[in-house]
């Protein structure tokens, strides 16, 4: 079914409905969104290929109050620290985060001229598993900062005492600049207007020595997973494929160095990319094999 849209990734106006969700997810249920007459289509932009989540008006209004306190629902009746310990104890071959850290450290190693103590900022640090594994993998030799707006998650991160923590929504604050590596792990899909957000992230990178790692859910989830899969929930604004993610990063003024699809140990389907300011590519070239 063809639909008129306004794609916030490429400004495209024509879309095709690829999936219809007919029941509210657990986040919507927690804020009282009813099941009667519920319909939430995922629409593929015919210009860039991104999938757009068209929320019912009632959901859109109510979810706006929930986004900054995501873990209030996600960990209802459980403990963030408990999940952290469980995931950290997983063997590397069973851990999405272990694979993520391996991708990042391998790319940094292959990209020439890495600084002796790179400054790393993880936006949306969540449970802290990614940064903790990165600290362990690099023997604490880098400088690490986690940004997390959720109060419960931020308190948990501080208790870990493994890296610096800023409890705030990332808004491109001037004090959050000068980083050699910025990571966005399963964050961008939550952003309604991803281009202005990425333009702020670019300002956080060292212009001639900066690298961005982005990982997002794959649009193929709409075809290869159940409609009740968490990835297809109401809090995700977009799903990406390599073309749409690459297009967005280029619109933000970055050079695309690598983009790929991966099936993670958890079964999640993801797209990841490395991108850098043009000055960084001129200075450092392309990553070696």
Cite the ranges covered by each PLM segment.
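Conserved N-terminal segment of class I S-adenosyl-L-methionine
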Residues: 1-185, 195-200, 261, 269-274, ...
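A SAM-dependent methyltransferase catalytic signature shared across enzymes that methylate proteins
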Residues: 9-16, 243-259
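Short, glycine-/aromatic-enriched active-site segment of Class I SAM-dependent methyltransferases
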Residues: 23-29, 214-239, 243-248
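Hydrophobic/aromatic residues located in beta-strands of well-ordered beta-sheets
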Residues: 144, 212-214
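A short His-aromatic
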Residues: 186-190
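A short glycine-rich, Lys/Arg-flanked "PGG" loop and its adjoining helix->strand segment in the class I
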Residues: 196-211
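Short beta-strand->alpha-helix junction loop in the catalytic core
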Residues: 218-220, 263-266
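Substrate-binding/catalytic lobe of Class I Rossmann-like enzymes that use SAM or dcSAM, i.e.
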Residues: 250-255, 267-268, 278
